[in-house]
């Protein structure tokens, strides 16, 4: 009888452990890091310098610290509708203008600008994103072009 009580205790303990394990694995904790609105003063100096150079006089609407693929980024919304994403060290990762508008030309690397002038003259850059392999550039006509890290054209993405 004592042996039966001891086995029952172990069985109940095992059931409770399994239940706790199941409940914890189903919890909504896969995004522990939440978006946090912060003051523009919290931006790294590199980001502030970028905004001052390319968006001088444009008011910052909001700054949010976000985690994209567990990497901290600063998402900055500007009063003119442009959005700039900065990496953890403050370097720009993406610059996006509203539909039909262009981003400031000085942001795009010169070799890419030269390519666009030759092959897509008259179509400004609506969005540019730094990727692990180079750059993705969206033109105002919604054509997506991919360039390597040196700015050499690779392919058209959405054909």
Where are the language model's segments positioned?
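First exposed extracellular module after export/assembly in secreted or surface-exposed proteins
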Residues: 2-4, 35-159
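Bacterial signal peptide processing site
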Residues: 27-30
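Hydrophobic helical h-region of N-terminal Sec-dependent signal peptides
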Residues: 12-20
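Bacterial N-terminal signal peptides that target proteins for export
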Residues: 2-13
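C-terminal motif of bacterial Sec signal peptides marking the signal peptidase cleavage site
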Residues: 21-25
């Amino acid at each position: 009888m004592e042996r039966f009580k001891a086995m029952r205790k172990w069985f109940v303990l095992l059931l409770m452990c399994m239940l706790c394990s199941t409940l914890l694995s189903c919890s909504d904790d896969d995004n522990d890091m939440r978006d946090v609105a912060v003051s523009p003063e919290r931006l790294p100096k590199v980001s502030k310098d970028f905004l001052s150079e390319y968006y001088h006089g444009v008011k910052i609407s909001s700054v949010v610290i976000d985690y994209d693929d567990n990497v901290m980024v600063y998402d900055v919304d500007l009063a003119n509708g442009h959005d700039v994403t900065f990496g953890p060290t403050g370097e720009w990762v993406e610059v996006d203008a509203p539909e039909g508008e262009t981003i400031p030309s000085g942001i795009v690397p010169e070799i890419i600008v030269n390519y666009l002038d030759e092959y897509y003259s008259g179509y400004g850059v609506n969005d540019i994103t730094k990727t692990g392999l180079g750059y993705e550039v969206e033109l105002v006509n919604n054509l997506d072009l991919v360039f390597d890290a040196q700015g050499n054209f690779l392919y058209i993405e959405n054909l």
